[in-house]
Amino acid sequence: PYAYEALSPNISGDTLHFHHDKHFQTYVDNLNTALADCPECQSKPLDELLKNLDRLPDPKRTAIRNNGGGVYNHLLYFDGMCACHSSRPSGGLAMAMERDFGSFEGWKEQMKAAALGQFGSGYAWLVSETSGKLSVMKLPNQDCPLSMGLWPVLCLDVWEHAYYLDYQNRRAEYVDRWFERVNWPFAQERYEGCRQ
């Protein structure tokens, strides 16, 4: 949704290029391969597949979980950032953060703790229940909150390929810089979508 250099200096054009055109594209290609001989899966939207992994044919379940999660999670990650420097959420999302985390800063602390506490690869998530209650969680690999009945509002990719070219092993610095690029209008739209 933006040029490779648009998130610089927070995330470099090189990182974004490799992340999007190499890593993300591999998930897209592998998901398409997994779906190629599964006609009953092809007619369903990706979010429905991830919500209903237990209903997928056994031979396809793991490939769709891993690669479908890789596609969905990356799309949310990329769309959840913007070229403009972000400030804070507004509207219903801001009120929900105040209610559920005590403050915007309380949310940031929990999100950062989840991102830094994720051992190895995975994501930190801001998720909502259908009631609108927000929480923060971390999940390994390409697991997706949809599979747990939760609605993803934002995600922060903490796989090393998301930051290593720019920050090497300084994940905390990457997390701090990610906060500066959060696409709050997108997050607000996602939050409103949890009740539909």
Which residues make up each language-model segment?
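Feature for soluble, non-membrane regions of globular proteins
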Residues: P1-Q196
